């Protein structure tokens, strides 16, 4: 049985602008267009979920958005309307949503610390790409999760 592994992380701003996209496995960089497409599809699902008038839950974790072949996408929607999309490849393994929920909350915390840095005056989409704290913390979190 092949254990699950993270495929990509996408972070989108309040207006669905892409703030960050990280393809976890460097060998899959050639699949950038596919992962961008999955991220865009996920944004449509997120917007449908959060704009649903019947939605009663205030939980930021939106859960499983969809499955494309062997890649499952999950989402977290912050109170500032920042969207976190995480894709997991799990061909023969059931991924526990509680694990994904915890992982997305930790990513959200890392993101918050990076963009709320009082010493950084530059809060643009480049903030995450240039933040050493964000990159190192995220890479450590991802490597820990992939080997658990």
UniProtKB/Swiss-Prot annotation:
This is Uncharacterized protein C15A10.12c. Signal peptide: none annotated. GO terms for biological process: endoplasmic reticulum to Golgi vesicle-mediated transport. One of its GO terms (cellular component) is nucleus. It comes from Schizosaccharomyces pombe (strain 972 / ATCC 24843) (Fission yeast). Gene3D superfamilies: 3.30.450.70. SUPFAM superfamilies: SNARE-like.
């Amino acid at each position: 049985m092949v254990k699950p592994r993270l495929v990509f992380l996408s972070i989108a701003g309040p207006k669905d602008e892409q703030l960050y996209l990280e393809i976890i496995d460097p060998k899959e960089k050639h699949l950038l267009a596919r992962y961008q497409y999955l991220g865009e599809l996920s944004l449509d699902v997120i917007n449908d979920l959060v704009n649903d008038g019947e939605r009663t839950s205030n939980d930021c974790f939106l859960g499983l958005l969809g499955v494309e072949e062997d890649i499952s996408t999950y989402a977290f929607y912050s109170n500032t309307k920042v969207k976190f999309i995480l894709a997991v490849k799990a061909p023969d393994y059931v991924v526990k949503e509680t694990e994904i929920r915890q992982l997305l909350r930790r990513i959200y915390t890392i993101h918050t610390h990076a963009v709320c840095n009082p010493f950084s005056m530059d809060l643009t989409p480049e903030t995450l790409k240039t933040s050493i704290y964000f990159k190192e913390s995220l890479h450590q979190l991802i490597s820990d999760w992939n080997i658990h």
